[in-house]
Amino acid sequence: MIDNCIANQASKEFSVSEISNKIKELLENNFGYIKVKGEISGLKRASSGHAYFNLKENTAILACTCWRPILAKIKFPLNDGMEVVIGGKLSSYSGNSRYQLSVDNLQPAGLGAMLQILNERKTRLEKEGLFNKKRIPIPFLPDKIGVITSITGAVIKDIIHRIRERFPTRIIIWQVSVQGENSGHEMAEAIEGFNNLEEIHKPSVIIVARGGGSIEDLWSFNDEILVRAAYNSKIPIISAVGHEADYTLIDLAADKRAPTPTAAAEFAVPVRSILNNTIQSYEKILFNNTNRLIKYHEQSIVNYDKIHSYFSYYINNRQQLLDEIGFNLLDVLIRFIALKETKIKSFSKERINYAKIINYKILELTHQTAYLFKSVNNTLKNFEYKLELNSTLLASLDYHNVLKRGFAIVKGDAGNFLSSKSAATNEQSLNIKFFDGEINVVLSCHDLNTRSN
């Protein structure tokens, strides 16, 4: 087409601007969107925000112009010597009679260049603290799980299958591209979208997943906007990118990293059967502990009976001792009075005028008698006080007083104590003890049905 155009214009005379415009037209019409791989050299940034550089390969050089809006979208710094792949359109610049490539898209080319960009970005984001946030714990039993991935691959099928196999839970899928120029933005918007849902629709945990691939395939998961979205998420995020050996920047910002998408599903939900076994084990432990507690209290009742018997015996002995002391004091008092009377009579028989002596002795006897009665009275009061204390203690330990307040002791066929309705269900008859006696009750089928209802 170019050859035909030149042949048709062979005899025509052009001005400088005409031939420049013609060349520009030929370039733009015959070369559409192209991709060129090369090494950046002579990079210059103008005050206007545009960037100018050459793309070279050996001795060949292609001038390139990167306008400010395009330059702002590039997420890594441009440097001389960096190998890149540039997409854009060819055009000519009439100011110096040269053609140039107008940049629409620029990506690093080669593993070395990509690793350099990755390390620089990782260092910068790490200094900002994006990888040192307080991790949000993954909920034990999430009611809803959000999954951000492509719906065309095997990843989503593996995740759904694994969750349904372990513990069926509602899954909300946010479809995104996991590879390509805008995939990082799509995944970041998905994270923000889940966080902005109403609480009733919001998932309890988010899984960001993709299958394995090369560093180029997984490059979107190193996108800065995606890393920041994961850092700012109020919902815990599980990253599951590639295989166990693959590592991306979102793994450092996520709340938990899974080596594979299937492992992410395992982190999100437990195994229902294992959970059921654990609950049954706890139920058995609770049942055994309850039985031990019942037996302990049954033994306590037996011990209280023994204590009651001991204190009854102790109080009876003290009462008997008190009675003996009372009898002895009375005998002593009678003998003392009789002795004094005998002395008085002997004085009268001898007709000796002992009036003063007798009066003195009578007064002395009166004082001694008063003292003796006071001493006996104090002793009796002391014993009565101790008896009252021991009786009060005995009454507090006597379970018969509890029965007088309306309680009863229920025993089964084997004489075992029954403390609950469910324990009485397996018994044929019951022995019920009240404070004033006990009765035996035979349970009928009607009683059992009524009790079950």
UniProtKB/Swiss-Prot annotation:
Biological function: Bidirectionally degrades single-stranded DNA into large acid-insoluble oligonucleotides, which are then degraded further into small acid-soluble oligonucleotides.
PANTHER family documented for this protein: EXODEOXYRIBONUCLEASE 7 LARGE SUBUNIT
Principal localisation: cytoplasm
GO molecular function, one term: nucleic acid binding
Biological processes, Gene Ontology terms: DNA catabolic process
Protein name as it appears in the record: Exodeoxyribonuclease 7 large subunit
Source taxon at top rank: Bacteria
Record's subcellular location: Cytoplasm
Catalytic activity: Exonucleolytic cleavage in either 5'- to 3'- or 3'- to 5'-direction to yield nucleoside 5'-phosphates
One GO term describing the cellular component: cytoplasm
Family statement drawn from the similarity comment of this UniProt entry: Belongs to the XseA family.
